[in-house]
């Protein structure tokens, strides 16, 4: 087996695994948004506090997806 082909194949496999971080971020953001909507429907007067907490939590959740995407791009383009 050609070592260069092996390294390229493993880089593609690693990029695919790193891209799976987007799945977790999507699930987390979806759950958080659903709970925020439930909270606002129960206590409309607390909607400002709930939404600000949701935005901060979503930013942290999406940061994981961005890190996974960056690692995948690094592996694909061998930076």
Curated annotation (Swiss-Prot):
The chain crosses the membrane at residues 7-27, 56-76. One of its GO terms (biological process) is proton motive force-driven ATP synthesis. Keywords: ATP synthesis, Cell membrane, CF(0), Hydrogen ion transport, Ion transport, Lipid-binding, Membrane, Transmembrane, Transmembrane helix, Transport. The keyword Transport applies. One of its GO terms (cellular component) is proton-transporting two-sector ATPase complex, proton-transporting domain. It is a multi-pass membrane protein. Disulfide bonds: none annotated. The keyword Transmembrane applies. InterPro entries: ATP_synth_csu_bac/chlpt, ATP_synth_F0_csu, ATP_synth_F0_csu_DDCD_BS, ATP_synth_F0_csu_sf, ATPase_proteolipid_c-like_dom, F/V-ATP_Csub_sf. Pfam families: ATP-synt_C (PF00137). NCBIfam families: ATP_synt_c. Belongs to the ATPase C chain family. F(1)F(0) ATP synthase produces ATP from ADP in the presence of a proton or sodium gradient. F-type ATPases consist of two structural domains, F(1) containing the extramembraneous catalytic core and F(0) containing the membrane proton channel, linked together by a central stalk and a peripheral stalk. During catalysis, ATP synthesis in the catalytic domain of F(1) is coupled via a rotary mechanism of the central stalk subunits to proton translocation. Key component of the F(0) channel; it plays a direct role in translocation across the membrane. A homomeric c-ring of between 10-14 subunits forms the central stalk rotor element with the F(1) delta and epsilon subunits. F-type ATPases have 2 components, F(1) - the catalytic core - and F(0) - the membrane proton channel. F(1) has five subunits: alpha(3), beta(3), gamma(1), delta(1), epsilon(1). F(0) has three main subunits: a(1), b(2) and c(10-14). The alpha and beta chains form an alternating ring which encloses part of the gamma chain. F(1) is attached to F(0) by a central stalk formed by the gamma and epsilon chains, while a peripheral stalk is formed by the delta and b chains. This is ATP synthase subunit c. It comes from Clostridium botulinum (strain Hall / ATCC 3502 / NCTC 13319 / Type A). The lineage of its organism: Bacteria, Bacillati, Bacillota, Clostridia, Eubacteriales.
